[in-house]
């Protein structure tokens, strides 16, 4: 299924090339910046029944914009960006359906299981999404944190996915090496996730056409979802029509209902 997104940088809805993100902004390559406020996109997604999407704050200076997005559709979108034990509950109260966390549960490149356990105790696993966004190195996928610039020691594989699935309701996984390039999805990663993930996962990165959405739906057996960013027409792209994604979800929902009916 198609999952929408609202990426925020400096208070604006943007699309960036994932591997270029930095706090200073000196090397960040921005492909698109919208004239619409974040709430405009939230209301659009709500109108079209697009559940499971997310709001991501890419760096500081986005709190007001994030609250604008979440407040426009309470309970309709997940939120990620600087989430920690102290503010997770506040973001849920601000309207997030779930909070997305990555960097805070890692210290010095290592997964901090106590921090993860504390967060689960605070908000509950059903309100927690783990971001396992990754980059490929030596033929394997490794979780990256700190604006996707720092490699951790955590490899994304079947054992890790099954282990961490006990602490969250869903995974969000950006293929950082292809994020924002509109040159096609990382099919190897999508195929692997379809085998490894015992819970739903949303993949993001590289989608360039509606065929990528069809591929992820087929390969992922309905458990792996796709976020399309830079290629989408509402984000200035030319590869994918937003209306086609909405129609794909409607058609897929209808087909699934028919196929599972007694």
Predicted regions and their residues:
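Catalytic cores of alpha/beta
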Residues: 64-99, 188-226, 237, 242
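Short, acidic/polar
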Residues: 32-45, 84-90, 153-162
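Structural preference for beta-strand elements that scaffold enzyme active sites
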Residues: 1-5, 51-54, 76-78, 97-100, ...
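Glycine-rich, proline-tolerant flexible connector loops at the mouths of alpha/beta enzymes
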Residues: 49-65, 103-109, 173-182
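Conserved, mostly hydrophobic/aromatic
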Residues: 6-7, 45, 53, 91, ...
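C-terminal helical cap(s) of enzyme catalytic domains, especially alpha/beta-barrels
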Residues: 111-122, 213-262
